[in-house]
Swiss-Prot record:
F-type ATPases have 2 components, CF(1) - the catalytic core - and CF(0) - the membrane proton channel. CF(1) has five subunits: alpha(3), beta(3), gamma(1), delta(1), epsilon(1). CF(0) has three main subunits: a, b and c. PANTHER family: ATP SYNTHASE DELTA/EPSILON CHAIN, ATP SYNTHASE EPSILON CHAIN, CHLOROPLASTIC. NCBIfam families: ATP_synt_epsi, PRK00571.1-3, PRK13446.1. Its main location: membrane. This is ATP synthase epsilon chain. Belongs to the ATPase epsilon chain family. The gene is atpC. It is a peripheral membrane protein. CDD domains: F1-ATPase_delta (cd12152). InterPro entries: ATP_F1_dsu/esu_C_sf, ATP_synth_F1_dsu/esu, ATP_synth_F1_dsu/esu_N, ATP_synth_F1_esu_C, ATPsynth_dsu/esu_N.
Amino acid sequence: MAEKIKLEIVTPEKKVLSEMVDIVVAPGQEGEFGVLPHHIPFLSKLKVGELRYRIGQTLRCVAIMGGYAEVLPDQVTILAPAAEEAGEIDVIRAKAARERAERRLAETKDRLEFTRAQAALQRAVARLKVAEKT
């Protein structure tokens, strides 16, 4: 049996996921990073995006809304403000959120509102990207 690494994804509301996986690929602030069993320990800030993991031949995805990753030789813990597995994502709601954010980006002149609209767009796009992979 091949070695596995434990992946845990935790939000303030709940433990989203706890699985033994073959590999984790996370959206780090400085770019994606992959983790296999026996990886050197490190901490990383995460950006909004798609976290992928593989169990056997099955690739699965989770939309994460930023946060932090703690990597240990036998475990990856993701602490995120929000995270959704592909099956939990409401595609209609995510598309509506994307359209609202795009409209706000086109209409706003306020710098703070523009930044908020950009963040909303990133979240909606991440959800849609993960939902497409189901």
